[in-house]
Amino acid sequence: MEAFEISDFKEHAKKKSMWAGALNKVTISGLMGVFTEDEDLMALPIHRDHCPALLKIFDELIVNATDHERACHSKTKKVTYIKISFDKGVFSCENDGPGIPIAKHEQASLIAKRDVYVPEVASCFFLAGTNINKAKDCIKGGTNGVGLKLAMVHSQWAILTTADGAQKYVQQINQRLDIIEPPTITPSREMFTRIELMPVYQELGYAEPLSETEQADLSAWIYLRACQCAAYVGKGTTIYYNDKPCRTGSVMALAKMYTLLSAPNSTIHTATIKADAKPYSLHPLQVAAVVSPKFKKFEHVSIINGVNCVKGEHVTFLKKTINEMVIKKFQQTIKDKNRKTTLRDSCSNIFVVIVGSIPGIEWTGQRKDELSIAENVFKTHYSIPSSFLTSMTRSIVDILLQSISKKDNHKQVDVDKYTRARNAGGKRAQDCMLLAAEGDSALSLLRTGLTLGKSNPSGPSFDFCGMISLGGVIMNACKKVTNITTDSGETIMVRNEQLTNNKVLQGIVQVLGLDFNCHYKTQEERAKLRYGCIVACVDQDLDGCGKILGLLLAYFHLFWPQLIIHGFVKRLLTPLIRVYEKGKTMPVEFYYEQEFDAWAKKQTSLVNHTVKYYKGLAAHDTHEVKSMFKHFDNMVYTFTLDDSAKELFHIYFGGESELRKRELCTGVVPLTETQTQSIHSVRRIPCSLHLQVDTKAYKLDAIERQIPNFLDGMTRARRKILAGGVKCFASNNRERKVFQFGGYVADHMFYHHGDMSLNTSIIKAAQYYPGSSHLYPVFIGIGSFGSRHLGGKDAGSPRYISVQLASEFIKTMFPAEDSWLLPYVFEDGQRAEPEYYVPVLPLAIMEYGANPSEGWKYTTWARQLEDILALVRAYVDKDNPKHELLHYAIKHKITILPLRPSNYNFKGHLKRFGQYYYSYGTYDISEQRNIITITELPLRVPTVAYIESIKKSSNRMTFIEEIIDYSSSETIEILVKLKPNSLNRIVEEFKETEEQDSIENFLRLRNCLHSHLNFVKPKGGIIEFNSYYEILYAWLPYRRELYQKRLMREHAVLKLRIIMETAIVRYINESAELNLSHYEDEKEASRILSEHGFPPLNHTLIISPEFASIEELNQKALQGCYTYILSLQARELLIAAKTRRVEKIKKMQARLDKVEQLLQESPFPGASVWLEEIDAVEKAIIKGRNTQWKFH
């Protein structure tokens, strides 16, 4: 049988690390001490190894003293001082509280077989003392009754002196408890306890005597513990170390001592953490926290029940509470859902000091310095003051934001499509330029130019030019940052996750070697960059110059404005127009349209010239690229940062839409010839000029693609589609596939934004189902063009569905005669679509629409056709009984006649409450079957989207068992099967109001027809209307003026044609006499005709005036020649031909008389024509509605 050895605790404690820790020197993490006695105490790290057991010896005596101070706190005799000293290896601890009772201990005397007194038992008998069985509300730091005995068992000698007010007890213990001298007991009125000891240093790994460094380290550590105790006992008890009082009598003083070196002058946040129930409420905790970016991990000092504990649930509770506050504040501040912060992040910059007493805790760990208590004690009973958490959280979040900014500075991404210049980052880095190409086609052009080699030896090459792709688009960095002002007043710019992860912009940062924490004010800073400049190489269109280049400029202005100031940001200004003249090899190049226009006006004719536009870099042919790169430096222009640029960058790219809206209410002021000459002369472009011209033009163009013009209710894309349709289907209105027609529009109307979006616009322009945007589509759809089921999203592929022009409607709503009078968009020098139409009726208020753009929201609800017809007719017809009333209303900007929302194709109800109309769906209830059948939905609510919205509503689905959709493309039949006994509960929970009943409320069968009447103006910019009447009133003068222009132009053309036809008839009559066939040439014949008074005429202009204005007709029609006579064929000189011409003249004269009459009619020229056209439009609409917009 194996033998079991039995040893007493004394011998075991000598040899083992039980309770005290290692008995030899080891590296102790976080060991600190106070080495200075200056006015400002400072805790410093101790880097040398030390013995944990030795420190435990000293610590046990100190904790015993603070336990005694706490125990006497409520007694008559309090502890007023604790004196700790350490000199030449001798440690001493004394307090003036009631001494240890000096009485014989009967049990110990029987065991020792001699007289043993209580002080000896307390200091020499293991597992003996008052800490063996502690009460639940005990706040002593001592445990197990072994602390003082550990000190004795590891000491060469120790002297215990105590006085209880009657007697004084002195006893010496030698040789590690092996020799216990008899005590000396004498009368005394004193009260105190003092223990002096000399540890067995040699056995614990120290020199004997202590070396100078060992003495210094141990003294510093003991001094630190004395300072901790001073904070723990607080006022009323003075802690002395080597006879000098410790000046750390508060938690704030202790926190300052710890952080004075690492974070001097930092704000110390303090608080008292109180509990709400006994025994915890009797002992509030004092906490001090220092927040500083210099701290890299969470650190704490906890003096709980006098013990310097290394961890515990109280710390966990504090960290979790801080973390919750930090996360909440962080998300509120940064407003970036992708940015997350963790417990480690939120607490990594905090140093916390916690001092106080916690009842009922247990001490765990080898050295009994780990606090253990149920965590729910803190959650349930303790609360941290909100003011403390708030102030500290602000400081933490400020540091987190700063750290994010610095951390993101080193974000690495894979840089795609980058070719490094050979000298980039080297000694000649400042001579290198980074060419930032808009996309792949631009990269191809640059590569061609940079690899010309021997054919262009002095030109740019990869030696000093690098290339990078901008990917065709750039993120707006201005909207991806948060500017946060810290408590110290510093502004921190925090980039969100999207921006820091953006491969294009981050790639530019890496390639250039940019640093977000550097301003680049000095040449020394700029010399660290890998390139001397960045050159934007973008297309000469609105997307390239206005958008992409503007965003690149905004990016540099946001983070490195000094680089723009010092000419670092440039652009490659390529020719926009080249004019090739016959017989000449070198073209005339223009960089701005204004330059070309000014040049063209000076030319007598451009017949022998070929004009080519180059809006895209890919349009330049290889031989043109070679020519460009021979003069490359002359095409590189530098941006300058002028005074107004900062505000304009904020307006166009910042987050304040109201500022941008005010700026975009007006159109672009084009560059003057003087401005373009100035730009070329110095090759410098002010940023403000670029923003006010190119960027503004892009923004306005984007608006016109998203928000309709109030004159025709159309966006630019829809207008291109209509113009393309009129042209495409003019001769043959046979159906065409959507994708084929889209190609025609892109080609003839110069649509540059992709076939997918164009095809989608064509499909929408042909959709005709309940709830579709267009009540009056301009196209007839053949095939599946979508339904209300998915809101039109279920349309077929553009390859399979076809369209025709809704010609009967188009011809009446947009009279062909108007097309010659409208202003047109010119793309690449060619006429495209009108800038706007002016339809016979105000289409802008006849259809539905919704879209946001640049801070504006556009929402319209179609108005009732009958009301619109009544209003327009009343305006036009002077005999209309409401004519005078309407004109009075217009003049005084009031509303009289109704202009209600349209209810066409809608089986629900429209009701008005206050200033808004509401649309209501309909339903039937079968109480027996417990089913509600929805038979109509509110206006413009798609079926599937509606059902999904109900299913997502948890409080509604509580009452619903099943939803079944039996709806067709024309009708609504949605069965809502209720759970048993739900109907009464629904009526009870979803209260009936004046505006809706319970079922309408429950099933969301009502929507508000709230409008945002923001439209594009004829000359660009946005106009904000307050009512549909205002739109109508604004539209009326444009349509009215068009009739006068139409009649006046027709009048001018008729007069010219009558002049020409009359001259021809006269010539026929006199042709035999004139006998022009006998003359040698046309010049001689023309002289004869002139001498006989025949007018020279511009025959082509008179026959086909097309887009010529009245002024142009009057100027050029009579400045022609005699071709109209000299080109007459023999059969045209016959009497029958002459007779036909005379009849034609009579008809033209009759029409001229009619036109003159129309010009004089009341209330304005052409009023009767307008009324006729209104009738024709109404007739076409009725036919379209009766035929499901098929017109057959």
UniProtKB/Swiss-Prot annotation:
Its EC number is 5.6.2.2. GO terms for molecular function: ATP binding; DNA binding; DNA topoisomerase type II (double strand cut, ATP-hydrolyzing) activity; metal ion binding. Residues 707-1174 form the Topo IIA-type catalytic domain. ATP binds at N64, N95, G142, T143, N144, G145, V146, G147, L148, K149. Mg(2+) 1 binds at E438, D539. Gene3D superfamilies: 3.30.1360.40, 3.30.1490.30, 3.30.230.10, 3.40.50.670, Histidine kinase-like ATPase, C-terminal domain, Topoisomerase II, domain 5, Topoisomerase, domain 3. Binds two Mg(2+) per subunit. The magnesium ions form salt bridges with both the protein and the DNA. Can also accept other divalent metal cations, such as Mn(2+) or Ca(2+). Keywords: ATP-binding, DNA-binding, Early protein, Host cytoplasm, Isomerase, Magnesium, Metal-binding, Nucleotide-binding, Topoisomerase. Mg(2+) 2 binds at D539, D541. InterPro entries: DNA_Topoisomerase_II, HATPase_C_sf, Ribsml_uS5_D2-typ_fold_subgr, Topo_IIA, Topo_IIA-like_dom_sf, Topo_IIA_A/C_ab, Topo_IIA_A_a_sf, Topo_IIA_B_C. Transmembrane segments: none annotated. Induction: Expressed in the early phase of the viral replicative cycle. It is transcribed early, under the control of an early promoter, but its transcript levels are maintained and still present during late infection. It is an enzyme of class 5 (isomerase). GO terms for biological process: DNA topological change; sister chromatid segregation. Its cofactor is Mg(2+); Mn(2+); Ca(2+). The keyword Nucleotide-binding applies. Belongs to the type II topoisomerase family. This is DNA topoisomerase 2.
